[in-house]
């Protein structure tokens, strides 16, 4: 049966594509150089210090350790930890079994965070809690440290309303008679092996999303770098004037965006093979005697919202990774957001986008069924050729080619819509698991999260039933091979099992697509019957 055979081909192509993509990614990563990193970055580790301050605007809440001024914890107030939780999602965390921090400081010959000193500055603040008020345009949180030689270091965290980017500003006043030379650095470090309580993957679906490091440079707009590469000391050492460094997981990102002070160094490193580090170091910054210098950088801690990330740094929005089919996923996402702005429900937006896509591909679908009908009409002649030249396979092929030419039929014409639909299906899959806007997005009744699997498996069963109806309409009477007929009859069950762990939004798309197929199939076939 042609339709069911097409489903089988679709599944095969889907799995093959994902395996090929994983292989390509691994091959690319293996080409990276294995460079040794300056050991100054290894000393910056967790030290117990009870002195902390708390900073909050309306979307993020930060905990800053006054020893070094690192961001040790960050909660995203607009996102729940889990679907039914009242707690906000904690992106950065410092615990006994898991560390995820955003660190920054001044290193080099005269830097207070330099490994030469084997310590970091212990900053002070005038209070412990800082909250952005309802009518305030920005919140400035200064912390200060005075060195032994009288140099004043002021590190200021600047937050704005409804913004996930935090400006980090160093104000260094040098009252001495000698110049100071230092570098600003920013790095992100994270425990490689996740504890069970911190599972960032969606549902039980086997195709996990990327969790690891990433960067942007003069030569590469966006590159991912696996934690495994860092753990095996296959480290990055890249000189670049532009760019950023980041750590990514499904839906969320932490990124340092350095100020353009010349050529920065992007590096990776491993601490005890269990903690991955990616960071940047600026060129040497000279602070003349009796003068002050302002040194800036920016930190993103939040969801991967494309339109906001694009404003913070060039190419940062590319961390919303739609894979190889980004050129399809991006316009699909834009169309989906337009529909959502009108309808107000992501599920109904998916249904509407399904109708739109199936409407656009209708000419191909019609051509497919016409080709299938012609092929079915030719079956007696094809069978006659096979019986007549049963002992000569080459002659059978030649005669069948001549028959196709005579009848003006392309035997592969029925497969074209499948090749068109597969990229659409894949791009929608990547969009659903990669767009934070769809995280915990409800539809109707029991479907409270379109980005995760149906908790009761109702949608996959409905999808299987729609396949069964397509099978009944198409009929399998023309299939002579008993084994092939059994396989085709069993396809709805196979696909139902295959879709159990798919995001419910994707299963919804396939259900609607199948219903459209049933309607289009009955309409086209009935017209063909009338025109005979």
Swiss-Prot record:
Cellular compartment(s): Cell membrane
Covalent S-S links between cysteines: none
CDD domains cross-referenced by the UniProt entry: 5TM_YidC_Alb3, EcYidC-like_peri
Coarse class of the protein's main subcellular location: membrane
TM annotation in the entry: 7-27, 336-356, 413-433, 450-470, 492-512
Biological process annotations from GO: protein insertion into membrane; protein transport
Record membrane topology: Multi-pass membrane protein
Pfam family, one: YidC_periplas
Coiled-coil stretches noted in the UniProt entry, renumbered to this chain: none
GO molecular function, one term: membrane insertase activity
A Gene Ontology cellular-component term: plasma membrane
Subunit comment: Interacts with the Sec translocase complex via SecD. Specifically interacts with transmembrane segments of nascent integral membrane proteins during membrane integration.
Family: Belongs to the OXA1/ALB3/YidC family. Type 1 subfamily.
The protein's name in its UniProt record: Membrane protein insertase YidC
Species of origin: Buchnera aphidicola subsp. Acyrthosiphon pisum (strain APS) (Acyrthosiphon pisum symbiotic bacterium)
